[in-house]
Swiss-Prot record:
Family annotation (PANTHER family): EMB|CAB62440.1-RELATED, F-BOX/RNI SUPERFAMILY PROTEIN-RELATED
Span of domain FBD: 346-396
Pfam families named among the record's database cross-references: F-box, FBD, LRR_2
Positions of the F-box domain: 13-61
Keywords (A to Z) from UniProt: Leucine-rich repeat, Repeat
Protein name (database record): Putative F-box/FBD/LRR-repeat protein At4g13965
Keyword Protein biosynthesis: no
UniProt entry tagged with the keyword Cell inner membrane: no
Classification via InterPro entries: F-box-like_dom_sf, F-box_AtFBL13-like, F-box_dom, FBD, FBL13/AtMIF1-like, LRR_dom_sf, LRR_PRU1-like
Organism: Arabidopsis thaliana
LRR repeats: from-to residues: 67-93, 98-122, 141-168, 169-194, 213-241, 258-284
């Protein structure tokens, strides 16, 4: 019996070692890098497997009780790496545990490993990006976060870079910001979380290869700060937060746009520059922006509109009149309305039934529908009574009694056109 148990134990011990090396490496890559390194003591076969890991992750706080050992351990791991390509390196550096000089050296060593993706998070001081980064030929993805200052030379050349994320990163000056983007000739995806106290007031994004652009700004950003966007290949645009101005030029390929803006827009062309899109999400006060006269959203088939102010319903009228091919309409009301029920003014319904209602609208959804508000009821009934192709209308309201629900359904059903066989849902 004992021999059987011992034999069974030997079999169990050998099971992992009998797996293909590629699978073992894949398993090790799911572990924290420091844990994966310690597996080298398990057997001779495992002694070198960790050196083939495609991804390495290090956090200096994990070694905060071993002062000055972090940079040595990371350096040793990078110099021991044997795979032809290091697919990803994620460094979380606290400068009181690993100073700027050592951090710069680690980045330089990583580039010698044919690094494809670098994620660098810095805290505890201001870190200046080393010049070696600005001429890395293998880097495909770069994510820089927090206490980082970029002094970008005009000689920058990141020819392989396709994805760039900048989280609260600051630039030495306007020229550095321009140099960074001009030195990325194949950049396709850019995400910017703007540093609130940046020295760059006008952020110019002129990249001919750029396809996706996402911008986040906080309420503490200078209200005079803004953006100039000139990217002819852009297909997706999202802007969130407070901006002083936004000039969008030459974006003929734009397909989807999301504008969640909480401050006044100085320029007048914001919506006019979005007329080529097929999908559009709008969240801002209509009183803060001028609707482009005569502009038609010929390609628009999907529209989401946040109705957080009474005036938003009049923006809806303008959008319906200007979107002849609209197929899907979603209205989103905040959970708790900040404006009074008896608001001054009323909804200005279209003078002529919009073309999209007559020929194209198939799906209508309203989240946060206030069925007791006269203006919202008027909007809902107008859309239901004037659509010929509507297949489904869904209304999400706050919790109401069974009697109120029956009353609301009856009220809406009374105007649904029989010829469009619309499915009316109340949730």
């Amino acid at each position: 019996m004992k021999r059987r148990k011992r034999g069974r134990g030997i079999v169990n011990a050998d099971r992992i070692s009998q797996l293909p090396e590629a699978l073992i490496i894949q398993i090790l890559s799911l572990l924290p890098t420091e844990v994966a390194v310690t597996t080298s003591v398990l057997s001779k076969q495992w002694q070198f497997l960790w050196k083939m890991l495609p991804k390495l992750n290090f956090d200096s706080l994990d070694q905060r009780h071993e002062f000055k050992t972090f940079s040595k351990n990371v350096k040793r791991a990078l110099l021991s790496h044997k795979a032809p390509v290091l697919h990803s390196l994620h460094l979380i550096v606290h400068l009181h545990l690993c100073n700027s000089m050592n951090t710069a050296k680690l980045i330089g060593i990583a580039f010698a490993c044919n690094l494809r993706k670098l994620v660098l998070e810095v805290d505890g001081g201001r870190f200046s990006i080393p010049e070696s980064l600005y001429n890395c030929e293998t880097l495909d993805t770069l994510e820089l976060k927090y206490s980082i200052l970029m002094d970008v030379p005009s000689s920058i050349c990141l020819k392989s870079l396709r994805t760039l994320h900048l989280h609260y990163v600051d630039f030495k000056d306007n020229e550095s910001a321009l140099n960074l983007l001009s030195g990325c000739p194949n950049l396709e995806n850019l995400v910017v979380h703007r540093y609130p106290f940046s020295s760059v007031k006008t952020y110019t994004i002129a990249v001919s290869s750029l396809k996706r652009l996402t911008i986040y700004t906080s309420s503490t950003v200078d209200p005079r700060a803004g953006y100039v966007i000139n990217s002819p290949s852009l297909t997706y645009l999202k802007i969130v937060g407070q901006i002083g101005f936004c000039l969008i030029e030459n974006v003929p390929e734009l397909v989807e746009a999301s504008m969640i803006v909480s401050s006044q827009i100085i320029n007048k062309n914001l919506l006019e520059s979005l007329t080529s899109v097929k999908r559009l999400f709008l969240e801002f006060s209509p009183l803060m922006i001028k609707f482009p006269a005569g502009s038609i959203f010929y390609q628009l088939v999907y529209l989401e509109l946040l109705t957080h102010e009474a005036e938003c319903l009049n923006l809806l009228t303008l959008m319906l009149n200007s979107s002849p091919k609209l197929q899907i309409l979603k209205l989103l009301s905040p959970k708790y309305q900040s404006w009074k029920k008896d608001v001054v003014g009323k909804w200005n319904k279209p003078k002529i039934v919009p073309e999209c209602l007559l020929f194209h609208l198939e799906t209508f959804m309203w989240k946060g529908y206030e069925w007791k508000r006269n203006d919202e009821t008027e909007v809902a009934k107008y859309i239901l009574s004037n659509t010929n192709r509507l297949k489904r209308a869904t209304f999400f309201s706050k919790p109401i009694s069974s009697e109120e629900r029956v009353k609301m359904v009856k009220n809406l059903n009374s105007v649904v056109r029989a010829l469009n066989s619309c499915q009316l849902l109340i949730k």
